[in-house]
Design a protein with these regions (language model features):
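Residues at secondary-structure transition points
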Residues: 2, 30, 34, 38, ...
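DPxDG-like acidic metal-binding loop motif
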Residues: 20-56
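Short helix-terminating capping/connector loops at secondary-structure junctions
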Residues: 13-17, 70-73, 168
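Surface "functional belts" at beta-alpha junctions
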Residues: 50-149, 177, 182-183, 187
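Short amphipathic alpha-helical face segments that pack within enzyme cores
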Residues: 2-3, 38, 59, 153-157
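Acyltransferase
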Residues: 144-192
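N-terminal beta-alpha supersecondary unit
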Residues: 1-27
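Stable alpha-helical structural segments in soluble proteins, enriched in small hydrophobic residues
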Residues: 7-11, 46, 64, 154-162
Length: 192
């Protein structure tokens, strides 16, 4: 890809050495995860450097500015759109960014997170949270807009893994899809 070529050219011109490659491991778009993983694995294999996958939902958590959040007890709930009224989500501790529940593909309805919201404040964010805002109605539910899993938020998480030697085997790493790929039916005559 042209962007990768430009980035590597810039690194050569600046005299930068690549020590590892970090990537968002999912959940997320099937195609996006496949393309990103293929590029990252190719770079790691070709340059004989480590691969560092980072949980996409954790990257979303790292992007929340601390000044937007209270100092009292609450949880972070990143949400990635998984089509219709479904989201990829999990709960995270606000200080450590450690996952406190399993990552799931959750269909959102009026009862979603009702038990958790009865016990604590939850901050929802990510591209899946917007569609949930009118469905999840509770005084302890707060929504933060315009939060994306950008590389600049992944960098500190990846650096920590790098320093701790937390690498994946390049040959066997697969992204975290969470759901099986279901191709849409073709609308092109002759491919049906």
């Amino acid at each position: 890809p042209v962007f990768v070529e430009q980035l590597l050219q810039m690194a050569r011109e600046e005299g930068w050495l690549l020590d590892a490659v970090a990537l968002s491991q999912g959940p997320g778009s099937y195609t996006g995860l496949r393309i990103g993983t293929s590029i990252a694995k190719g770079l790691c294999y070709g340059m004989n450097i480590p691969l560092i996958p980072v949980d996409t939902l954790q990257i979303l958590c790292a992007s929340i500015p601390s000044h937007l959040l209270p100092s009292s007890s609450y949880s972070l709930c990143p949400m990635l759109d998984a089509r219709r009224m479904e989201v990829y989500t999990a709960m995270y501790h606000p200080n450590t960014l450690q996952q406190t529940t399993d990552i799931v593909a959750k269909v959102i309805d009026e009862q979603s997170f009702a038990e958790e919201l009865s016990e604590q404040t939850i901050y929802f964010f990510g591209n899946g949270a917007k569609k949930c805002q009118t469905t999840i109605q509770h005084p302890n539910a707060h929504f933060i807009e315009n939060v994306e899993p950008l590389a600049k938020w992944m960098q500190p998480l990846a650096e920590k893994r790098f320093l701790n030697g937390q690498f994946e085997d390049v040959a066997y790493f697969v992204p975290f899809y969470l759901k099986d790929f279901v191709p849409a039916p073709s609308h092109i005559k002759g491919l049906q």
